[in-house]
């Protein structure tokens, strides 16, 4: 593959520039390819010299950490989420839906289902490798992707589209069967200072994470308030959509039932494919057990 051609096409599609890797550089040449490799090695990525989706997400997080961040103080929250236009109560005090004036605007690809309720079999949990939910939605829009929910650093749940809409977040044939959430977490411990500087505090670290049979280097965990928000979202989707309070039988790897789309319940992205590691360290069964005990 011509890497220069690939990078130029990627830049036009996603909106990045050669100068983001080399100040003042404008060419999509071998020098840029080398600079992308250096960036990829520094971020634990496959160093192929091509700025694909994974490299782009890390690039955005790197650039965003140097920008001034203003935490939006909202005073008007919803007490429900929406499925086929109908409100579903949720036991959480910070919810902003796609119908609210202060919604995060998602423009990525999605499919609107009309005339009937689609059957949602399972709920897919992601981390976004972004510094905040606004940045996550920006990346999704540039990549022409979508998801039903985001959970921000302070626990705010954003609904980005109706749960009856098919969003593009889990890959191909999984999307019509599920809804999903992107939980804000830049993943790499190098971003801890950004969180502390902007008033969120230091993130917990996962130091014993494993996925697909391999041990992981220490990475940042979700804040406790994000896990509480996730629990509230799981519970609302269980009650409103009838998704069973079940976790995959395979705890830290691809689950055969999830992969074959016969599973019904709550799972992580890595349960679908070996190509994903999110959300390693998230004990879904423990969250579901708390809901059962409520």
Place the predicted regions along the sequence by residue.
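Short acidic, glycine/serine/threonine-rich helix-capping segments at coil-helix boundaries
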Residues: 1-62
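Basic/polar, cationic surfaces and motifs that engage anionic cell-wall
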Residues: 62, 70-84, 191-294
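Active-site-adjacent loop/helix surface patches within enzyme catalytic domains
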Residues: 92-239, 243
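Structured segments of extracytoplasmic/periplasmic soluble domains
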Residues: 35-46, 58-65, 139, 184-187, ...
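Beta-sheet entry/capping signal
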Residues: 21, 122, 148, 264-265
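Catalytic-site microenvironment of enzymes
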Residues: 2, 9-10, 42, 67, ...
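Catalytic phosphate/metal-binding cores of nucleic-acid and nucleotide-processing enzymes, i.e., regions
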Residues: 89
């Amino acid at each position: 593959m011509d890497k220069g051609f690939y990078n130029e096409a990627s830049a036009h599609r996603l909106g990045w520039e050669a100068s983001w890797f080399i100040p003042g550089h404008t060419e999509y040449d071998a020098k840029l390819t080398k600079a992308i490799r250096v960036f990829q090695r520094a971020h634990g990525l496959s160093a192929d010299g091509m700025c694909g989706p994974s490299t782009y997400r890390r690039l955005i997080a790197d650039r965003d950490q140097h920008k001034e961040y203003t935490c939006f103080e909202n005073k008007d929250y919803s007490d429900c989420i929406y499925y086929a236009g109908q409100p579903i109560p949720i036991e959480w005090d910070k919810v902003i839906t796609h119908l609210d004036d202060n919604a995060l605007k998602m423009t990525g690809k999605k499919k609107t289902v009309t005339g009937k309720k689609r059957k949602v079999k399972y709920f897919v949990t992601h981390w976004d490798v972004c510094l905040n939910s606004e940045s996550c939605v920006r990346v999704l829009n540039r990549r022409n992707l979508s998801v039903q929910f985001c959970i921000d650093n302070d626990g705010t749940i954003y609904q980005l589209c109706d749960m009856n809409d098919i969003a593009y977040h889990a890959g191909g044939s999984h999307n019509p069967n599920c809804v999903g959430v992107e939980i804000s977490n830049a993943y790499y411990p190098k971003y801890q200072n950004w969180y502390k500087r902007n008033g969120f505090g230091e993130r917990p670290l996962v130091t014993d994470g494993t996925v697909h049979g391999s041990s992981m280097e220490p990475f940042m965990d979700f804040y406790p308030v994000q896990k509480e928000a996730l629990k509230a979202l799981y519970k609302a989707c269980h009650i409103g959509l009838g998704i069973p309070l079940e976790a995959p039988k395979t705890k830290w790897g691809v689950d055969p039932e999830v992969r074959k789309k016969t599973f019904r319940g709550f799972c992580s992205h890595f349960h679908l494919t070996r190509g994903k590691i999110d959300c390693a360290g998230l004990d879904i069964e423990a969250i579901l057990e708390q809901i059962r005990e409520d």
